[in-house]
Amino acid sequence: MQYRKLRVIISGGGTGGHIFPALSIAGCLKSLNPETEILFVGAKGRMEMEKVPAAGYKIVGLEISGLRRSLSLENLKLPFRLLSSIRKAKRLIREFRPDIAIGVGGYASAPLLRAAQSLGVPTLIQEQNGFAGLANKMLARKAGRICVAYEGMERFFPADRIVMTGNPIRSEIVPADGKMREEALNFYGLDGSRRQLLIVGGSLGSR
């Protein structure tokens, strides 16, 4: 089967909660269309600069950082870093010529998607949480589609552009078969006759 070559920029990161859904999206796009060319854009010095290349994708870093909630002189640098990052993002977009730009949240996605929107590139946002992040709320105003995992997200985003997709899951996370379940029960000393519930903490607070 012949596929049209697609060019996709995926931007966001800072924590695994943004990075791993982004990698899941990239993997799904590749499985649907092997000709898809994907470029990641993240923040220099953050987790995505290691995780994305390890997964086999190219990534470009921007000199951008998040807004500190406490009083800090670093916040004075933020407007200049943002403008510089938007300029670099525009250059990347002109060179790569994407068909679409996808933002997965986090401050790293803001310059890239803002640049894409200003250049007329279609944009899509993926929001993993039940409470939308600041970057996604700002970018949603001009996004073509907003993919969400929970009901009630119209309190953050325009209802007519919301698509309920659930959260992207990596292909390597597979349903446990009987043998795997038995091994887990033995390892944790659990009673196999009872239902088991796994609770996993999220983001940096899970420590």
Predicted features and spans:
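Active-site-proximal region of nucleotide-activated glycan assembly enzymes
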Residues: 58, 117-185, 190
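An aromatic- and histidine-rich active-site surface loop
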Residues: 46-50, 98-119
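Nucleotide-sugar donor-binding and catalytic loop/hinge architecture
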Residues: 1-6, 52, 178-199
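Conserved nucleotide-sugar phosphate-binding/catalytic loop shared by glycosyltransferases and other
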Residues: 5-13, 32-81, 86
